[in-house]
């Protein structure tokens, strides 16, 4: 896609296998948003993405990182820079993950392009795909590329299933080349059938989401309506969400600039002084901090100081409970374009509501407030210590 000058806006990658990483290893998409989890191949995070958003993971190792043992003391607890994110339902395929992500983001109309869940024309991959090119590179006189294609095609038993029918069959219809509206079949296997069953179950569950397949050439999936190019153009012109998306994309760069230049980059000295005195309320100090616009060096020093914050007066149970409450508070916020400063205001408000009312424990609660801030701020923004700047997560 990138070589054809088609720039993706969002890239989803949830498969932890090394071979799945190779699909994006050569991709150059500096303006794309990557949605992934921490169980993927590590080299994925070193690619030049504009933003990286972590979703929940069903992998046991990743789950143990996101929900570490709360019985250990804060000094030995794993210093995670984020709270446990939401888990997207996985159907085992990138097609099911894309549908689930679109549903999670609130989409009511989803259009699939290139979805087949079968082997139309006995083809295993699209032309120019990684595994097809790899088969040609490794082919020889006694092991041609067709051998690799045959093994991939017959790795599981094949059986015919009904093919997706064209909504308006005609002479130029790919589903009905003879002009007759008769049912055709395509070859599939148990793996693709599992993905199809997952889609059919979720389409029946979320009936308010309309799902289409553009010029389908694969198997028929109950709940997915075939769509032609002319119908897609009409659908896009009538969709009320298209102008809103165009407006959001045009504002993306300006919002990103506001995040980077936000006045929430506070001074480390003032923060440490507030932590030692514990005389000022969080709301008062927030107003004092946000009046100043500090440099990236101050933000770096603040980050290092907060990582060394003393949390011995806060029990691990209360800390984890407070983090969960804070995450619930932020997730309940409407998805509207806000600045990093607005999110930080909401974060401080949530943390202040968690402080105890007793004077004896309130002073000690101020001491671990910075620990909460340190571990929860990554939910709103990611900090790159090498570059010394804040950026949107």
Swiss-Prot record:
Residues 173-183 have a biased composition (Polar residues). It comes from the Bacteria. Residues 164-183 are annotated as: Disordered. This is Uncharacterized protein TP_0762. It comes from Treponema pallidum (strain Nichols).
